[in-house]
Amino acid sequence: MSTIRPVFYVSDGTGITAETIGHSLLTQFSGFNFVTDRMSFIDDADKARDAALRARAAGERYQVRPVVVNSCVDPQLSMILAESGALMLDVFAPFIEPLERELNAPRHSRVGRAHGMVDFETYHRRINAMNFALSHDDGIALNYDEADVILVAVSRAGKTPTCIYLALHYGIRAANYPLTEEDLESERLPPRLRNYRSKLFGLTIDPERLQQIRQERRANSRYSAAETCRREVATAERMFQMERIPTLSTTNTSIEEISSKVLSTLGLQREMF
């Protein structure tokens, strides 16, 4: 049996929902080479027919039944997509009818609700949070009064991508502070952070993994030396423990998992956008 399986994320909007759910499902299966393709804004019959033809062609090319993860809200478009002969995984259909019965109300199909700019205030909050994260990245700005969270870690431990994810997906004003050699020498919380203890969250990382990351940025330097990485990580972890700062290792942890842990630990209640 071929291990190659074509998978299509089809949506009448951005395709983010279909791809996110589809990716989560596919990660439950090992030993397969999933060839994925996102088809966004499939919002009329002609586009749906073209999408169905692409899926069918992929099935013929690989001699295997394709998979379509579908988040189109229009049932007619879903019916056209099914003509591809693919295994259809409908993101919404299994849940809409039970909800209609429970709420005693019909759905109002609207394209792009999940990731469109339906609520301007919410969208504005996301943009402001993103601007905040960028302007408070790597200690650029040190005015933390408006921050919801301040990530603290040695250089290249995952602070920046986590802050950006928190801003984009939760509207969290996330700043980050890089621990310098001077900070680590004292093994005490840097003075500029002491008034914000309740907002602090420490990130740590396996020294060997940190060295790999730093080598990509500045190879064969003191910054990326194995001893430097071991010393910085060990000192930062002692500081976090001494100052009772909640911590999490980013070594084998996804940005999504890190973000969820930060939110739950600090008690930040935000809906995902």
Curated annotation (Swiss-Prot):
Domain of life of the organism encoding this protein: Bacteria
EC number: 2.7.11.33, 2.7.4.28
GO MF entry, a single one: ATP binding
Record's keyword terms, sorted: Kinase, Nucleotide-binding, Serine/threonine-protein kinase, Transferase
UniProt keyword Transferase, yes or no: yes
Catalytic reaction equation(s): [pyruvate, water dikinase] + ADP = [pyruvate, water dikinase]-phosphate + AMP + H(+); [pyruvate, water dikinase]-phosphate + phosphate + H(+) = [pyruvate, water dikinase] + diphosphate
UniProt: ADP binding residues: 153-160
Pfam families the UniProt entry points to: Kinase-PPPase
Similarity comment text for this entry: Belongs to the pyruvate, phosphate/water dikinase regulatory protein family. PSRP subfamily.
Function of the protein: Bifunctional serine/threonine kinase and phosphorylase involved in the regulation of the phosphoenolpyruvate synthase (PEPS) by catalyzing its phosphorylation/dephosphorylation.
Name of protein: Putative phosphoenolpyruvate synthase regulatory protein
Organismal lineage: Bacteria, Pseudomonadati, Pseudomonadota, Gammaproteobacteria, Lysobacterales
